[in-house]
A protein has these predicted regions:
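C-terminal ends and interior cores of transmembrane alpha-helices
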Residues: 79-93, 300-313
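Cytoplasmic helix-loop-helix junction between adjacent transmembrane helices
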Residues: 102-140
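Symmetry-related core transmembrane helices of the 12-TM Major Facilitator Superfamily/SLC fold
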Residues: 160-178, 384-399
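Juxtamembrane intracellular "pre-TM" segments in multi-pass secondary transporters
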Residues: 1-4, 181-221
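Helix-loop boundary and gating motifs at the non-cytosolic
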Residues: 2-55, 215-257, 261-265
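Helix-loop junctions on the cytosolic side of multi-pass membrane transporters
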Residues: 165, 173-192, 399-410
Length: 410
């Protein structure tokens, strides 16, 4: 069967990723808090199960992708993550939530690194930055489509979004098997593969790339801080809204939390689409210095937004800075991906990208339970303030990379 061109497949995959993610996770906090009965610590521990799986398997799956096939790694990832989503919807049990999250993290490692490396090799380093931004926009459009579907399903049964989201991902894995090309990647020839020795050689080459680059070493520190802060925000921000505020009526119309979170997620996507379009127009993604300056501003804004969200006693101000945070954070992903791919040789690209993901996962494993415990024993507000403080070094570190890149080829 004839394969499709790489860019349309990449963009469709990003759309499906956004669709299924928002379909499932628009109302997942309500499912976990109200149906499963999870508290702040359990919410974070579920995320920690995911991050432990990512930490354990991120680099091994990246190495396998560099040795054998990025295409195979990606389609396996869609199959496994689809199964994982379906598991959580089987019954409202904390044990199933943890199992689902661990399997989701395992499946994610097959996509992380490999998918980005695949499209970079297919279209080239200079073209891929703009494609990452377009891909992010397609993810957001998919998310926009997923929100009303998820809300409607959740109104009938809170478990239904998990089941449908999982089925869509598994089906898309079959589509990738049939139509996803792989023409830009050259695997290690079978005759040159020597079992575990090939794995260790690929890993060693990836480590050497990072160790020889002061830019990548500094970025590794940023990845750690990003991991340390993010679990508190991802798991506790919406729970903080439920804990602190009574959700108001709009124009005399009473809305339950499900409807409110649907509206909020729609706003997140609309503003994120706008921020990505602005970045696409203003940031020259072929020039690393431009990307770095943008990332410095993005992370400074994120820190400020988290702090204001945590201390605000106003529902509408909290919503406004939450939307701002989500919009600028959305830009950080494709810009980081574009810059990082510019620094890495093709033969170890998936491995090094997976190392960055592993550092992020390690940060989430270390920071998540600690901040979750703070949220349980003190307050979600305290946990979120600590999260902002943890992220605060990121912007100065991006400034440092800008200075270093004048001495080291970027």
């Amino acid at each position: 069967m004839k394969k499709l061109n790489a860019p349309p497949v990449y963009l469709l995959a990003m759309f499906i990723a956004g669709l299924t993610t928002k379909l499932v996770f628009t109302t997942h906090i309500i499912y976990r808090v109200q149906l499963v009965g999870m508290d702040a610590l359990q919410l974070v521990l579920a995320g920690t199960a995911l991050e432990i799986a990512v930490f354990l398997f991120e680099v091994p799956t990246g190495i396998v992708a560099d040795i054998y096939s990025r295409r195979l790694s990606t389609l396996l990832g869609f199959f496994i993550t689809g199964i994982a989503l379906g598991i959580e919807g089987l019954a409202p049990l904390f044990s199933l939530v943890v199992l689902s999250q661990a399997l989701l993290g395992f499946g994610f490692t097959f996509i992380s690194g490999a998918f980005s490396a695949w499209i970079t090799d297919e279209v080239g380093v200079r073209r891929v930055g703009e494609l990452f931004l377009r891909g992010r926009q397609l993810t957001l459009l998919g998310s926009l489509a997923g929100i009303p579907i998820g809300v409607m399903l959740a109104e009938s049964a809170l478990a239904l979004p998990f089941i449908l989201g999982g089925l869509i991902r598994v089906t898309f894995g079959i589509f990738l098997f049939l139509f996803m090309p792989e023409t830009g990647f050259t695997p290690i020839p079978k005759a040159a593969r020597t079992g575990w020795k090939t794995v260790f050689v690929t890993f060693s080459e990836g480590v050497a790339v990072v160790r020889k680059s002061s830019l990548l070493l500094t970025f590794a520190l940023i990845a750690l801080f990003v991991g340390l802060y993010s679990e508190a925000w991802d798991r506790l921000a919406q729970a903080h809204l439920l804990e602190i505020f009574v959700f108001p009526a709009i124009g005399g119309l009473e809305l339950d939390p499900i409807a409110w979170f649907g509206l909020l997620n729609t706003a997140f996507i609309v503003f994120s689409l706008a921020s990505n379009e602005i970045a696409k127009r203003l940031v020259d993604t072929a020039r690393s210095q431009r990307i770095l300056r943008a990332l410095e501003s993005v992370y400074a804004t994120m820190v400020l937004a988290i702090f204001i969200f945590a201390v605000s006693g106003s529902f509408y101000l909290s919503i406004a800075v939450m939307i701002l945070f989500d919009a600028v954070r959305s830009v950080s992903f494709p810009l980081t991906e574009a810059w990082l791919n510019q620094q890495i040789k093709s033969n170890v690209r998936a491995t090094v990208l997976s190392m960055a993901g592993q550092l992020d996962a390690f940060g989430e494993i270390a920071g998540g339970p600690a901040l979750g415990a703070v949220g349980r024993w003190f307050s979600t507000q305290t946990a979120l303030i600590m999260s902002a403080l943890i992220l605060s070094p990121a912007a100065p570190l991006y400034r440092r990379i800008q200075r270093l890149s004048g001495k080291e080829k970027a």
